[in-house]
Amino acid sequence: MKKIKVLIVDDSAVVRQTMADILASDPQIEVMATAADPFIAAERMKSDVPDVITLDVEMPRMDGITFLQKIMSQHPIPVVMCSTLTENGSETAMKALEYGAVEIIQKPKLGTKQFLEESRVRICDAIKAASQARLRKIPARPHAVAPKLSADVILEKPASRAMIQTTERVVVVGASTGGTEALRVFLESFPADCPPIVIVQHMPEGFTRAFAQRLDGICRISVKEAADNDSVIRGRALIAPGNRHMLLKRSGARYYVEIKDGPLVSRHRPSVDVLFRSAARYAGKNAVGVIMTGMGDDGASGMREMKDAGAMTIAQDEASCVVFGMPNEAIKRGGTVKVLPLESIAADVIRHCS
């Protein structure tokens, strides 16, 4: 199998070495070279073109955003932005996604053995997802494998008492690589009084708040990073915070979200499977499930449970996906009622909920 060639661009020698060590631990990935700044990287790329570039957000001589714009406007290559967990770093990382970056990862740092292993899994998975991404030109402006746990580790056993019936529709959405742009298109299409929407987008801790704030500023609906016990109400979308699972719950006729810790599920935290399975349990036929672009199979099993519970389920089609992984797995497992292009999904959801 051909290895994924990666060019690491970061002004910190420590980060470059740490990233190189992490990526070298995966047999599917090869570190082609490292560079301390974009000028060195550009020279290196004249003789060998990488499959994926990891790019620091803030560097001397030329910042990551400027270099990203040059790459995407001339010879697009999948770029994974590597950012520190700061307010400025998060905002810049969101801008990078608009300019064509396909993933954001948090810079590796010291921590517990479990933290380091989860960080390794996330970084290597981000590289693999990026290598599969479909890009477009954008004008300048052997190691231990993390166990693939099911959502059973997060979901408690179902309550035995019957719940009060409700007819309120609720929309649950899962996305990964390419999902930030897909969610923008999706959410911008809704009127201010849309059905409640609950979203899991695979994204590191700290970046989801900036992402939600950016969407809130451009959409007619309200968008916020979810907090534990937030009510699920019309006209608002809740986005799961990075590194926390989010479940849809119900008390009487009131929907709300529960935010909780727990192990990686389907290699992710937050996990789409956790959200979808909770929607199958607590919303049943009143739920609408949407699975969007992304690598892997997170959400595929949960979407099948939703369909079996009577929910309307929609997968984004291959042509409009950046990576046709998660939707394809949901289709293969018989979990989808419809397969639609991205631009048609919101209108279909609105029709179904009206």
UniProtKB/Swiss-Prot annotation:
Gene Ontology terms, MF aspect: phosphorelay response regulator activity; protein-glutamate methylesterase activity; protein-glutamine glutaminase activity
Coiled-coil regions listed in the entry: none
Keyword set includes Protein biosynthesis: no
EC category: hydrolase
EC number: 3.1.1.61, 3.5.1.44
GO cellular component: cytoplasm
PTM-bearing positions, type 4-aspartylphosphate: 56
Active site: 176, 202, 298
Catalytic activity field: [protein]-L-glutamate 5-O-methyl ester + H2O = L-glutamyl-[protein] + methanol + H(+); L-glutaminyl-[protein] + H2O = L-glutamyl-[protein] + NH4(+)
Entry's localization field: Cytoplasm
Biological function: Involved in chemotaxis. Part of a chemotaxis signal transduction system that modulates chemotaxis in response to various stimuli. Catalyzes the demethylation of specific methylglutamate residues introduced into the chemoreceptors (methyl-accepting chemotaxis proteins or MCP) by CheR. Also mediates the irreversible deamidation of specific glutamine residues to glutamic acid.
Family in the record: Belongs to the CheB family.
Domains: entry comment: Contains a C-terminal catalytic domain, and an N-terminal region which modulates catalytic activity.
Descriptive protein name: Protein-glutamate methylesterase/protein-glutamine glutaminase 2
